[in-house]
From Swiss-Prot:
It comes from the Viruses. The lineage of its organism: Viruses, Riboviria, Orthornavirae, Negarnaviricota, Polyploviricotina. The chain crosses the membrane at residues 23-43. The gene is M. Residues 44-97 are intravirion. It is a single-pass type III membrane protein. GO terms for biological process: protein complex oligomerization; symbiont genome entry into host cell via pore formation in plasma membrane; symbiont-mediated suppression of host autophagy. Forms a proton-selective ion channel that is necessary for the efficient release of the viral genome during virus entry. After attaching to the cell surface, the virion enters the cell by endocytosis. Acidification of the endosome triggers M2 ion channel activity. This is Matrix protein 2. The record marks 41 as: Seems to be involved in pH gating. Residues 71-80 have a biased composition (Basic and acidic residues).
Length: 97
């Protein structure tokens, strides 16, 4: 006898969804969490460079420059900009000639 004849097939009324109560609070909460997760994932993929630079450098503008000569301020600004530019070095820049 074949194994296929031994397998029980479900009857027609068991094919439907057993959880017909979609207004269950757990189902609603899971749906909301799933949608929020999807939105955050899409935003992360679109703006990952900005987001991670923000977390790395934060809102800090650096130490106070009160009483510091302008030449030293400019040197500090260049140094900070070079540090930010070095962070972008893992992106490949292709120039076509």
């Amino acid at each position: 006898m074949s194994l296929l004849t031994e397998v029980e097939t479900p009857i027609r009324n068991e094919w439907g969804c057993r959880c017909n109560d979609s207004s269950d609070s757990l189902v609603v909460a899971a749906s909301i969490i799933g949608i929020l997760h999807l939105i955050l994932w899409i935003l992360d993929r679109l703006f990952f460079k900005c987001i991670y630079r923000f977390f790395k450098h934060g809102l800090k503008r650096g130490p106070s420059t009160e009483g510091v000569p302008e030449s030293m301020r400019e040197e500090y600004r260049k140094e900070q900009q070079n540090a930010v530019d070095a962070d972008d070095s893992h992106f490949v820049s292709i120039e076509l000639e």
